[in-house]
């Protein structure tokens, strides 16, 4: 029991210390997000950025009129019913950047592991690894920037693992054209 408490306290404490630092100006729209966040993977074709659990960035992605939201009561936007929480995917920067955000249905700290599956109309396929840690009902966000856009479809898949040993899968249907 003591080990579980110490491990939980350490993980929870580390989540509050690992908050990414952003510039003084807060972003207002998707175009402002293009150079924010920490680069976690980069090659000749794509750049993957992690925005952490900043609620401002999550709201910008969610409130974009072109966002595809997968949650139980998504309103007029496309919806998929499921108990896992909320996943939002939208394209920005003329289809060259895929923004994503997830919010599992848990109040426990969680670790999210996932992929943005890029399926180009030319037949080329590419998976970009995404993920991070979130705490106490927060959202986690990121972006995948493509150096070239030949058109296609992006799908977000993945699972959030909480400290109470529960799994929260991204609902099917969280995807968008780019």
Label each residue range with its predicted role:
Residues 1-91:
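N-terminal prepro-regions of secreted/extracellular proteins
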Residues 68-178:
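Mature secreted bioactive peptide module from preproproteins
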